[in-house]
Curated annotation (Swiss-Prot):
SMART domains membership: Tryp_SPc
Family, as annotated: Belongs to the peptidase S1 family. Snake venom subfamily.
Domain of life assignment: Eukaryota
Protein's GO biological process: proteolysis
Protein name: Thrombin-like enzyme collinein-1
Site (Pharmacophore that directly interacts to Kv10.1/KCNH1/EAG1 channel selectivity filter): R79
Record's keyword annotation contains Secreted: yes
Class of the enzyme per the UniProt entry, highest EC level: hydrolase
Tissue spec. comment: Expressed by the venom gland.
This enzyme's EC code(s): 3.4.21.-
Activity regulation remarks: Inhibited by Cu(2+) and, to a lesser extent, by Zn(2+) and Ba(2+). Not inhibited by Ca(2+) and Mg(2+).
Length: 238
């Protein structure tokens, strides 16, 4: 996160860290949505992932942290009227449930859609400088604004974003505050509700008039809930 501050150790007990297992390199953030399931971005997927839960400072072994592996991974494969922008979402079932503690608790799914103009909280262990990468040991947090989707369409003509999409646009138009590389997969929390997943942005982060794109959790609720419930048929949204 660019332009943020170290998160309060008590404000991110649902935030998980995804690592590539063999290289032990940090990949992405993710969000614990119940004891057995994590929601993150599809572009964070690797063949061998290790998931740390209950971590603050990545450089020290925290006695209460828990390590898990994906038991199953689910991708949003609906074909009708969907583009790659709609599909940057991955649901991971953990190999065994985590135990809740003061530093481990789930973030509930949203009960209502997000409202443009909301102030949203972002957090992650992503780079705090851009374009050169400086990864912090502790997660950084910042507040950004939920913007009209058209702002992102205008800001990123090279992406050729479709007219209607299950994606959110958020940032600070003056620049200086933004999610960035390796914040991917982490949450966008608007008015206290888990509304977005860090997805894509401009190569150099936090530029003026270049807000970033977030997968819209609310529009994927049926898909998420059906999978968690063990439904054999996962209904694609219309």
């Amino acid at each position: 996160v660019i332009g943020g501050d170290e998160c309060n150790i008590n404000e991110h007990n649902f935030l998980v860290a995804l690592y590539e297992y063999w290289s032990q390199s940090f990949l992405c953030g993710g969000t614990l949505i119940n004891g057995e399931w994590v929601l993150t971005a599809a572009h964070c997927d690797r063949k061998h992932i290790l998931i740390y839960v209950g971590v603050h400072d990545r450089s020290v072994q925290f006695d209460k942290e828990q390590r898990r592996f994906p038991k199953e991974k689910y991708f949003f494969n609906c074909r009708n009227n969907f583009t790659k922008w709609d599909k940057d979402i991955m649901l991971i079932r953990l190999n065994k449930p985590v135990s809740y503690s003061e530093h481990i608790a789930p973030l509930s799914l949203p009960s209502s859609p997000p409202i443009v103009g909301s102030v949203c909280r972002v957090m992650g262990w992503g780079t705090i400088k851009s374009p050169q990468e400086t990864l912090p040991d502790v997660p950084h947090c910042a507040n950004i604004n939920l913007l009209d989707y058209e702002v992102c369409r205008t800001a990123h003509p090279q992406f050729r974003l479709p007219a209607t999409i299950r994606i959110l646009c958020a940032g600070v138009l003056e620049g200086g505050i933004d999610t960035c590389h390796r914040d991917s997969g982490g949450p966008l929390i608007c008015n206290g509700e888990f509304q977005g997943i860090v997805s894509w942005g401009d190569g150099s982060c936090a530029q003026p008039d270049k807000p970033a794109l977030y997968s819209k959790v609310f529009d994927h609720l049926d898909w998420i809930q059906n999978i968690i419930a063990g439904s054999e048929t996962v209904n694609c949204p219309s």
